Each structure stands twice: as C-alpha cells, then as structure tokens.
C-alpha cells in the first residue's frame, strides 16, 4: 500500500471510531474485523476477520468469472484465485467461526460454512455481475436477492413438471421440423431451447404483476419456436407456411420469409390477459431494437398514461450481434433519456458462442458479449443454458429488477447451436472441435430430466417419454390436417388502433384531402406563438423574433416557413392529435428558425407555446435527441407504428445525415407495408440544398429515396412555399390511411423574403 492509501485508511478508521455509520457498510465490516481480530505477535497484526470479508467481497466481484455457465466446454481461465491462502487464511481456520459470515447471513459461521455458501451462490450455474453498479441501493437489493432468494431456491414438483413440459415442447418442435422439412431454413433454437423457458416464465410473472403488454424484438434464430410456444401461433399455420400453401394472388404485397414475420395475441394466464407482440424485422441484426423501444414508449405514453410498469420490452440478441452491431450501443444509450426511456429493457442473449462461422475471440475484444451493460450500470446474469431452473430464477430476477428500478437488465444464456448457421450449413468446416463436443451433447431437456429424476423420487421415470410421444403425436396430427386440407390465407388482424384506417389505392393520390383551417384558428395559434407568461424573460434575440412573428400573424398576414410549420402543429393539437418531434437540435432547429421552446434568460426554464393553446388540446412533445441517426429514426418509426393518430416527426440535422439511418429507411420505412402489411405515417424532414456547405451537408440524396419508391409505398417531396408545407404536415393525419413521407426541407429559404404565404393559402387551399 502507498502512503496515500494508509493515510486514507487512517482517516476512514478515525471516522469509524467516532461514528461507525459514517462509513460504507463494507468498511464497517472491515474495521469490525480489524478491532475483533487484531493481536500483537512478533510485532505483526493478524486480520482474520477482514480477510474473510475480503474473501466474501472477492466472490461477489469475481465469482462470475469462475461460475459453471458453459454447458459444452471448459471456460476460459481468467486468473481468478479463491484459495483461502491468498487471503491470509489456512486450513486451520476452516473450523474457526467468523462474525464476517453475517455479511452473507451466517452469524458466527465457520470458514468452511462460509465457503460452502459462497461456492453455491457464486460458482454455480449463474454468474452474477453487479458489484460494479454505482447505486448502493441497487447493489444491496441485488446482493440480498442473490444471497437469499437464489441461495434458498426451492422449486416445487409442479413447477418442475411445468418447466419440463414447456422445454419438451420446444425440443420436440425443433426435432419435428428438422425431420419433416430436411434442409429447409428455419434457424432452429436447438441447443438454446431454454430461451422458451425464460420467455414463458417472464410472461407468467408479468401476468401476476399486472403487466398489460410485452413487446418482443428478436432476430431469426428460434423465432418459429417463440411464435408457437409463447405467442400461440398455431402449429397448423407454421406447417402451412412450410408446405408453401399460399396463393400469391390473395396475399397483399410481397410478403417475407416466415422467420421475419411478426405476430400478436392475447394470452390468458390465471384469468389475467396479457397482450404479447413480436415486432417483424429484417435480416439486419439488432435493427429492430430501437423500433421495439419506440413502440413501447408510444404505448406507455398513450395507452398506459406514463406507467412504465404496464408495458415491458424484451430484446433477444445473438452474442456476436450484441457485441458487434453499433445500433445496440445507440439504443442502450437511450435508457435514461427523457425522450426515449421505456422504464427498462429486458435484454436476453442467445449466446451460441459463435457468429455464423466466427469464433467469439474474433467477434469481440471484451470478456463478455454483454459488457456494454456497464455503460448504464445494468446487472448481468450469465446463465447455463442446460439449467432451466437457473433460467427460471434469472427470469424472476429480470422482471423484479426491471419493475423496481425501471432499468435495463441483461440475461446472457450460455448455450450452443446444434447445427450450422442454418440447417443446410456445415459448421465443422471451421469449428470441428466444438461441433464434435456438441454432436455428443444431450439436449437441454434430456439434461434436465436426468437431473430431476435423480433428485426427485416423485418424478416418474417414464414422464419424459410420455411427454415426448404425446406432443410429437399432436404435431403429426396438425401436419396431416394441413397436408389434407391446406389452410386458406388469413391476414393477421390489425392492431386495434389501426382498425379505423384502410389501405390506400392509386386514386387517393390524384387529389389531397381537406387540410385547410379558418382564420379564427390561425389567430388563436398565432397569439400563443407570440406571447410568453408574465415574468418570463427571454433573451433579446427571442424578443425580436416574437415581435417579427406577431407582425407576420397580425399585421402582414404573411407567414414564413417556421410560422407555417408551427401553425400546422398547433392546428393538429387543437384537433386533438398528439405530436412528437425528435432529432438533433430540433427544439431550436439547426438553422435557428423553429424555436418550439423558449428559454428564460435568467433561469433557463423552458416555455412551450404549443402546449399553451387550449385546455382541451392534445400533447406536444419535442426532444433534442442523442447524437444518433440509426437509433433515433428507428425509435420514431416504432413510435409511429404504435400511434397512427399521432404525428411523429424525425428531423435530420442535415439531410445527408439520413444515410446514417439507411437500414431503417430501406428495411422498414420503405418496405414494411409490402413485406409485413404495416402502414406508418412517419414524417422525415431532411434539410437539403447547396448553400455554402461544400460537398457535405448539401444533398439529402433524393435519388436514393426516389429509387425506393414503388407502388405508392411512400411520399418524397420538395416544397417551395410555407403553405404547401403546412398542408403536407396536416395531410399526414388527414388521409384515411398512413404513408411515410420524406420532405427535402429548405435552408436559406427559411428566411428568404419571397418564401411566404398569405392567409388565403391556409384557409382556402390544400396540398
């Protein structure tokens, strides 16, 4: 120890002697041990109590690095040593009692008892990673949960049978598809079937805790199993898709492969209904993450009145994707932001220990694929994929933690992929050693059944065979029915909030719906936009802006671009339509034109004119976003997906920045309607034009957007008058359907004296 360390400890010890509660609990225990065990022997001091405290803390901090979480191969050696000699203890201390044992609930326990409990808690099938969290309340809560609830685990015989039954269904379903549809891609869950255990227990517990909705985002692996086991898509429907029993003439749009499709259903659990939704997604891994978060935020805002506990997002990742895809970082960074927080995401990693053909040591620099959890102080549970009871407890922890602290939580399921990346792929080309191990490894169901019949005499040894035969017989019956009589095409029901809308036709674009307003409404909105509360003192530039705006509305009756935009928003708010706008610097506007909120020069308190139009108006929310395009545009797309009656706007700082979100534009906005029958009314503003910015920030790349236009899938516009902008905004919600719209918005024209519109253009015109 350095001199500064010793001085620091002396100061702490002095504080402790004056008031034990003035120092952290860990130091209290340390100094208790110091006072208790200090003895003089040949001038040395023996810290036996403190040594035991240090041993306990070491297990808490590093135990996850030695936990038994890998079902198929030996873990890497992370040089973690829990030998008692390292802590100044010896075998002669094993029978000695230590008050430090009270830290883990063993008052005056022997060192042997303390070690046995620590090994059971921290070196078992779950590796708990939480000590790095900087919130003491959270750490203490987790510590209590781990060292009491997890340690005292006691799963009853009925729950064990329930877990086994669900796990059996997951295993048999995959095996059935593998034998009936040889070589067909399905991206099976084999090796990771306890994913179903986790999701099923989350849904069960969510029902018990009055959660109303669970929204899931995941990639292709295991999707068919999740659809049938969790969302109750019928086996008949899945077999019908494998059989190719689809009449293209009866299907709307182009459709998509079965492992990209979404689904939604109401599930009844013990008289409680819960709505479960699986968001459709493309092959672009992790791109669905912000979409799920946006969807859930919209539901929380509009359906559940701000109650974060009513809707839970679950994101299912792959180990290679969560570590490698930057969109994961972008969305995780939203966790605590006012405009984007969802009350915590439950992250679940299907950790196959491989990405297609890439080994984990080529896929990341970090020890764990979940290490980005540290940026938001989230706990991580690394769980053995062959232990469904550990998975059950992990599900309980995830839900309880999320509901209590409104924070993200990560569950890392260490498992394996029995086949290649898809069922026709040969994994032994690149991982022969690993796949030699996997080929000999029993399924998670077989591992679990062997475990419980050895421990529970009440379990019938023939139960596994019985469950296997019964479920396999059921699947065969469903397949036979489909082969004999193919199911007719039945589009999935729309979400309730979309029922009032219809699909568009080509005739809808010949003319626009009525979007004009009367002059009385203009004046009402204009008054709100040009006045501030008594005592509110903006800076002088804003005072000048308000005077100019007042002149535009009440003297000249000529409105510029920003006036027309705010007028459109105000009119929709008075029509009881909510508005949400986000993007980089959108409150002021990149070009200092919008000023949707004003700020007091002395207090910095904001004032929102558009939230002070009327007591009966709808909500206006505008958020400066984190510096992200991909994540934020995906979030707003998801928000709009859930809220067809809300105008959702994303504005790029400059139009060319939209290519940072190209995946969302290509795979969701432009194509979701034809692939998944999902309409969307998102409005995207892209500042565009050669005005002194050189090769960057000049072009919004209209050619790229136009190349995506097909069969009336979206609108691309480039306008020159404020009134037309006004009508375009209102048209987004005036249509009897929804279409995404990209507007190449101006820059210098924002203040050009010729770019104005008179009142008649707003009261007696349309787009």
Give the label of every model feature segment:
Residues 1-34:
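Subset of Sec-pathway N-terminal targeting signals
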Residues 3, 186-193, 275-286, 318-326, ...:
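Alpha-helix capping and helix-loop boundary segments enriched in small/acidic/polar residues
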Residues 47-57, 61-99, 116, 171, ...:
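Flexible, glycine-rich loop/tail regions that form catalytic "lids" or insertion modules at the edges
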Residues 86-117, 122, 256, 358-363, ...:
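A structural-propensity feature for long, helix-poor, extended segments
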Residues 172, 176-236, 544-547, 551, ...:
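Active-site pocket-lining segments that scaffold enzyme catalytic pockets across diverse folds
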Residues 212-377, 381, 591-643:
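Cofactor-binding active-site loop characterized by glycine-rich and histidine/acidic residues
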Residues 355-366, 374-410, 414-420, 428:
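Conserved phosphate-handling catalytic cores of large alpha/beta enzymes
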């Amino acid at each position: 120890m350095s001199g500064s360390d010793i001085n620091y400890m002396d100061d702490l010890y002095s504080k402790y002697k004056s008031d034990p509660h003035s120092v952290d609990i860990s130091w209290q225990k340390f100094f208790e041990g110091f006072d208790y065990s200090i003895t003089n022997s040949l001038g040395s001091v023996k810290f036996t109590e403190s040594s035991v405290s240090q041993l306990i803390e070491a297990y808490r901090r590093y135990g996850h690095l030695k936990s038994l979480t890998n079902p198929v191969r030996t873990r890497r050696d992370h040089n973690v040593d829990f030998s008692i000699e390292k802590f100044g203890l010896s075998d002669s201390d094993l029978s000695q009692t230590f008050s430090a044992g009270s830290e883990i609930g063993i008052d005056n326990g022997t060192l042997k008892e303390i070690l046995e409990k620590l090994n059971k808690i921290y070196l078992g099938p779950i590796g708990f990673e939480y000590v790095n969290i900087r919130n003491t309340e959270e750490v203490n809560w987790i510590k209590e949960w781990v060292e009491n609830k997890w340690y005292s685990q006691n799963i009853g015989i009925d729950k064990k049978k329930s877990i086994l039954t669900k796990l059996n269904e997951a295993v048999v379903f995959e095996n059935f598809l593998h034998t009936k549809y040889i070589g067909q891609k399905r991206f099976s869950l084999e090796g990771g079937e306890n994913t179903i255990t986790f999701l099923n227990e989350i849904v069960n517990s969510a029902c018990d805790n009055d959660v109303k909705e669970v929204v899931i985002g995941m990639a292709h692996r295991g999707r068919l199993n999740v659809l049938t086991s969790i969302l109750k898509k019928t086996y008949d429907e899945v077999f019908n898709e494998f059989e190719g029993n689809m009449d293209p003439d009866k299907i709307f749009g182009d459709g998509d492969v079965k492992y990209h499709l979404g689904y939604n259903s109401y599930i009844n659990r013990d008289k409680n209904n819960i709505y479960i939704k699986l968001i459709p997604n493309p092959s672009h891994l992790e791109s669905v993450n912000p979409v799920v978060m946006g969807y859930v935020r919209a539901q929380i805002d509009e359906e559940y009145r701000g109650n974060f506990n009513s809707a839970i997002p679950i994101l299912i990742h792959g180990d290679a994707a969560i570590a490698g895809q930057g969109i994961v970082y972008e969305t995780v960074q939203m966790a605590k932001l006012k405009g984007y927080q969802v009350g915590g995401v439950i992250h679940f990693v299907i950790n196959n220990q491989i990405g297609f053909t890439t080994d984990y040591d080529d896929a990341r620099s970090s020890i764990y694929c979940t290490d980005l959890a540290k940026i938001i102080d989230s706990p991580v549970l690394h769980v053995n994929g062959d232990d469904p009871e550990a998975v059950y407890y992990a599900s309980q922890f995830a839900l309880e933690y999320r509901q209590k602290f409104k924070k993200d939580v990560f569950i890392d399921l260490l498992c394996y992929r029995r086949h290649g990346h898809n069922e026709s792929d040969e994994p032994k080309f690149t991982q022969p050693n690993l796949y030699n191990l996997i080929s000999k490894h029993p399924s998670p169901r077989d591992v679990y059944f062997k475990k419980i019949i050895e421990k529970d005499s009440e379990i019938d040894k023939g139960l596994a065979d019985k469950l296997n035969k019964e479920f396999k017989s059921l699947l065969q019956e469903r397949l036979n029915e489909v082969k004999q009589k193919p199911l007719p095409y039945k589009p999935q029901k729309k979400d309730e909030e979309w029922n009032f809308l219809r699909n568009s036709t080509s005739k809808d674009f010949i003319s626009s719906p009525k979007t004009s307003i009367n002059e009385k409404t203009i004046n009402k909105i204009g008054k709100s936009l040009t006045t501030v509360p008594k005592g509110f003192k903006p800076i002088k530039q804003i005072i000048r802006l308000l005077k100019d705006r007042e002149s535009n509305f009440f003297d000249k009756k000529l409105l510029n671009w920003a006036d027309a935009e705010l007028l459109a928003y105000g009119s929709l708010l008075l029509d009881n339509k909510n508005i949400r706008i986000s993007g980089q610097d959108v409150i002021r506007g990149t070009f200092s034109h919008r000023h949707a909120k004003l700020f007091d020069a002395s207090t910095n308190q904001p004032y929102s004119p558009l939230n002070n139009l009327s007591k009966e108006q709808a909500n206006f929310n505008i958020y400066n976003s984190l510096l992200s395009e991909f994540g934020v545009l995906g979030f707003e797309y998801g928000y709009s997906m859930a809220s067809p009656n809300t105008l959702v706007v994303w504005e790029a700082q400059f139009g060319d920045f939209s290519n940072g979100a190209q995946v969302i534009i290509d795979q969701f906005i432009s194509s979701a309607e034809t692939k998944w029958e999902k309409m969307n009314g998102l409005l995207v503003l892209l500042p565009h034009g050669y005005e002194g910015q050189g090769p960057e920030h000049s072009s919004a790349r209209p050619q790229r957007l136009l190349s995506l236009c097909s069969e009336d899938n979206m609108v691309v516009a480039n306008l020159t008058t404020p009134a037309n902008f006004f009508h375009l905004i209102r048209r987004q919600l005036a249509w009897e359907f929804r279409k995404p719209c990209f507007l190449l918005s101006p820059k210098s024209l924002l203040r050009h004296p010729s770019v104005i519109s008179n009142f008649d253009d707003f009261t007696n015109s349309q787009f």
